[in-house]
Amino acid sequence: MSKKIALLAGDGIGPEIIAEAVKVLAALGEHGELDVVLESGLIGGAAYEVTGTPLPAETLALAQDSDAILLGAVGGPQWETLDIKVRPEKGLLGIRSALGLFANLRPAILYPQLVGASTLKPEVVSGLDLMIVRELTGGIYFGQPRGVCRLEHGERQGFNTLVYKESEIRRIAQVAFTIAMKRDRRVCSVDKANVLEATELWREVMSEVAAEFPEVELSHMYVDNAAMQLVRAPKQFDVVVTTNMFGDILSDCAAMLTGSIGMLPSASLDQSGRGMYEPIHGSAPDIAGQGIANPLATILSVAMMLRYSLDSPAQATRLEKAVGAVLDQGLRTPDIYSPGTTQVSTGAMGDAVVEAFIHTPG
């Protein structure tokens, strides 16, 4: 039975990196025993220019009718002055909300070939492989009431509300523990339970869910300490699970441990495992159209798609090995280039991954 994948290239370098992912998906169809149907839609600034909205109804319908979504990137300086309701990023948020994509998975893996690209010492980061599981649809980003008001004496006051329901915490905990079962079986829950009541509940529910997974070791850590530990000794972590805002911050911190955000994929999943997959880097309008963007994060997002939404973990591992093989060959896009390696274009990197995939045992 075929799997339908929605391709949402978006803005900036989005179309270029999605084009390389399409090459990989074609190879999967020919050499990976996976039947996929690809259909494209508009999102972000590209959609706004054509339809006046960053998320056209047709794109949302396509996303809802697909087994998985592959997103390039959204945004650019030419849209920053638009009303916030129609800015490109609203298209991304709209899909997350409409599809109930509550679990954001952000792996931080340092490939041994790129250990010199990290700003930390090799002995600190060599072998790094952690997963941050971020709750994506609750917390202070969505809590009500929120806004800016004017007090009686004329001073302005801004306010937001941090709210989490027990059910929201429980479901993200179950995602984290399930992932940990397939890894090193350790979960670190990050909160600020010493000052925030909402995360005191977070800690309680995490401990309750841990009882359902006796094989997994649960630890708790305050977010300020977690930020410090990510820099001091990041390899102590296996799976980190945390709130929306804390995860937003910590995942970017973890990303830079690897030396280049051009290597890092992400997934946003619903309750059933359907998901949207995207590189964590932005639309990079400054290099768009130059053929120098790194497509590996997008290709690795395809690997995550295979693992979490398309029930093809063996092909996911095969694709990840192909990326490693290309790095072993010394091929690099400019963002990960170093003396002694060979600089290649976006398209050449994609072609090399396809070739390596074909010759990697399934």
Swiss-Prot record:
Binding of NAD(+), residues: 76-89, 282-294
GO molecular function annotations of the record: 3-isopropylmalate dehydrogenase activity; magnesium ion binding; NAD binding
Cofactor-binding details, from the entry: Binds 1 Mg(2+) or Mn(2+) ion per subunit.
Cofactor: Mg(2+); Mn(2+)
Residues reported to bind Mg(2+): D224, D248, D252
Gene Ontology biological process terms, A to Z: L-leucine biosynthetic process
Keyword Metal-binding part of the UniProt annotation: yes
Location in the cell: Cytoplasm
RNA-binding is among the record's keywords: no
Residues reported in the UniProt entry to bind substrate: R96, R106, R134, D224
EC code(s) of this entry: 1.1.1.85
Reaction(s) the record says it catalyses: (2R,3S)-3-isopropylmalate + NAD(+) = 4-methyl-2-oxopentanoate + CO2 + NADH
GO cellular component labels: cytosol
Site feature Important for catalysis, where: Y141, K192
Record keywords: Amino-acid biosynthesis, Branched-chain amino acid biosynthesis, Cytoplasm, Leucine biosynthesis, Magnesium, Manganese, Metal-binding, NAD, Oxidoreductase
Superkingdom of source: Bacteria
Alphabetized InterPro entries for the sequence: IsoCit/isopropylmalate_DH_CS, IsoPropMal-DH-like_dom, Isopropylmalate_DH
Principal location class: cytoplasm
Subunit field text: Homodimer.
Similarity comment: Belongs to the isocitrate and isopropylmalate dehydrogenases family. LeuB type 1 subfamily.
PANTHER family: 3-ISOPROPYLMALATE DEHYDROGENASE (PTHR42979:SF1)
Function: Catalyzes the oxidation of 3-carboxy-2-hydroxy-4-methylpentanoate (3-isopropylmalate) to 3-carboxy-4-methyl-2-oxopentanoate. The product decarboxylates to 4-methyl-2 oxopentanoate.
Protein name in UniProt: 3-isopropylmalate dehydrogenase
